[in-house]
Amino acid sequence: MEWSLERMREWVAGGMQSVRECESSALGTALCLALLFIWYCYRVGCEHTSPSLRGGFSPEPRVGAVPGVLASELSSRGGSSKLRQIGGVGGGGVSDEELNGFAYCQSSECFRCTKPGEGLNQRLYHSLQEYAKRYTWAGMGRVHKGVREQGRYLLCSRPSIQKPEVFFLPDLPSAPFFSREAQKHDVELLERSFPALLAEFESVYRLPSSRTGSSLPPGWKANSTPRGQWWTFYLVNQGTPMVLNARRCPRTWRVLGQLRTFIANNVFGNACFSVLSPGSTITEHYGPTNVRLRCHLGLKVPSGCELVVGGEPQCWSEGSCLLFDDSFLHTAFHDGSAEDGPRAVFMVDLWHPNVAAAERQALDYIFTPGR
């Protein structure tokens, strides 16, 4: 085989052309990958937009230490859940949510009621990482999954019978109503304490004189309703003790301290007397989370009163507890007459029995104030 300078020149030129084509192809591939990465980051950012958390709650346990709590000067916030009025009541327009049969809470004092905001998912994940660094990742599988998927879950616009508005813990058994056996100790304690709780309710529930010009007894909060009146007297509001109210109900406060599963140290915990006047309806709404069971102890229950959770109706009875998951769509109404008087219950939030102790500790840490 003969070698010539011309032949060698052709081979060199061909090789250089091949190199240039390879460089061009590699550059194009790199640009495509960069664009795909930018698009992916944009989609992930959009999916993790979620409601902002509000609150001012201490991570330290407070319900058990009654004297110290009542002596300290704690800031109190109202616990009203002001729901949009529907059906033309109040002169406002009807929103898409109201046309679907429920309305979102509008209270600026309630962390559940705030508008969706930027960064909650990132803050929750950061808090979970802080907790795991300080303690452990052991037992955090469901909490980690709930935080990771929270933004996507909350942005889902599909109608649902269960849709907690702040945090969903996956793989929890769910039902609108639970048997009293789910929290047997605390249910029995509350029912044994019925006479004391009823007496203290009657001591604080005093209709003000018309001469005072006030529409509420001292310490009570009014909640917006489509019709009628719904009042609440909080001893613990979103994890914060209401000091002045607690001083007026010392026996009820002691009962709270004896409950084994009361959510005392995060924003999902409340305890209050709740009054519904005759002719009142509470607009259908969702609670903030599925990690709790809401317990109602009937204090005064006239005829014509009903609680509907997830489409299932139940009636209260005096001296007995109802346990339900308020992350299901729920409402309550009092269709009795003025002569029947108000419906009154003692409401307290207990842990869902299938939330493990390690998960409770982590959720107390994550859902403390300022996080």
Curated annotation (Swiss-Prot):
It comes from Danio rerio. Keywords: Dioxygenase, Membrane, Oxidoreductase, Signal-anchor, Transmembrane, Transmembrane helix. Residues 43-371 are lumenal. It is found in: Membrane. The keyword Transmembrane helix applies. This is Aspartate beta-hydroxylase domain-containing protein 2. The chain crosses the membrane at residues 26-42. Residues 1-25 are extracellular. The keyword Oxidoreductase applies. One of its GO terms (cellular component) is membrane. It is an enzyme of class 1 (oxidoreductase). The gene is asphd2. Its EC number is 1.14.11.-. It is a single-pass type II membrane protein.
